[in-house]
Every structure is written in structure tokens, then in C-alpha cells.
Amino acid sequence: MPKLEMMLLVLLIFPLSYFIAAGGQVVQVDRRGDGLAGYLQRGDRDVQDCQVSTPGSKWGRCCLNRVCGPMCCPASHCYCVYHRGRGHGCSC
């Protein structure tokens, strides 16, 4: 088998092993440093998207619990409610 064909075959098989090792789920490698957001959004965690501090910035606040308005709820069983005159808040 020529070298080029062998390299192409290896390149085709190599990513497949990662796919199988992950249990058949697509594994997305994040090389920009936003891996924490991807980690928090996996599984059955009750995680909302990170809130961006300033428009155009990738920095913000990530919560392990539900995001409600500008804050994170203190526990995973809390949910976000709207209080008339006071705005949004967590109800636990």
C-alpha cells in the first residue's frame, strides 16, 4: 500500500476511535479556552448559559445552578420567578 493511501486510512480510522471511546457521542474539542462552558452543559445538570459581562466579550458568569436575572440561584432545586415590583428572583 503506498504511503499516501496508508496516511489517509490512518486519518480516517484515528477519529473513529475517539468517537467509539466517547460512547458514540460526538466529542468537540474546544481549543479557545471555553471548555468550562462545555463541561457545565454536559449531562443532566440544570445549567443555563453563561451570562456575558459585556457585549462582544466571551467573559461572564457561569452558574452551576439556574441563572435568574443577573444572579445565580443558590441551589439546584430553585427556580426563577418574577415578583411584581421587585423583578426576577430565585424561589427555593
Curated annotation (Swiss-Prot):
Keywords: Acetylcholine receptor inhibiting toxin, Disulfide bond, Hydroxylation, Ion channel impairing toxin, Neurotoxin, Postsynaptic neurotoxin, Secreted, Signal, Toxin. One of its GO terms (cellular component) is extracellular region. Disulfide bonds join C63-C72, C68-C80, C73-C90, C78-C92. The modification 4-hydroxyproline is found at P55, P70, P74. It is found in: Secreted. VxXXA stands for the form with the Pro-55 hydroxylated. A second major form has both Pro-55 and Pro-74 hydroxylated. The two major forms VxXXA and [hydroxyPro-74]VxXXA exist in a 1:1 ratio. Minor forms are [hydroxyPro-70,hydroxyPro-74]VxXXA and [Pro-55]VxXXA. Residues 1-24 form the signal peptide. GO terms for molecular function: acetylcholine receptor inhibitor activity; ion channel regulator activity; toxin activity. Residues 25-45 form a propeptide. Expressed by the venom duct. It comes from the Eukaryota. The cysteine framework is XX (C-CC-C-CC-C-C-C-C). Displays a mini-granulin fold, a structure composed of two short, stacked beta-hairpins connected by two parallel disulfide bonds. This newly described fold is derived from the same cysteine connectivity as knottins (ICK fold). The name 'mini-granulin fold' comes from the structural homology with the N-terminal region of the human granulin. Homodimer or pseudo-homodimer. Three dimers exist: homodimer of VxXXA, pseudo-homodimer of both VxXXA and [hydroxyPro-74]VxXXA and homodimer of [hydroxyPro-74]VxXXA. These three components exist in a 1:2:1 ratio. Belongs to the conotoxin D superfamily. Alpha-conotoxins act on postsynaptic membranes, they bind to the nicotinic acetylcholine receptors (nAChR) and thus inhibit them. Through its two C-terminal domains, this homodimeric protein would bind to two nAChR allosteric sites, located outside the nAChR C-loop of the principal binding face and at the adjacent binding interface in a clockwise direction. This toxin specifically blocks mammalian neuronal nAChR of the alpha-7/CHRNA7, alpha-3-beta-2/CHRNA3-CHRNB2 (IC(50)=370 nM) and alpha-4-beta-2/CHRNA4-CHRNB2 subtypes. This is Alpha-conotoxin VxXXA. It comes from Conus vexillum. The lineage of its organism: Eukaryota, Metazoa, Spiralia, Lophotrochozoa, Mollusca.
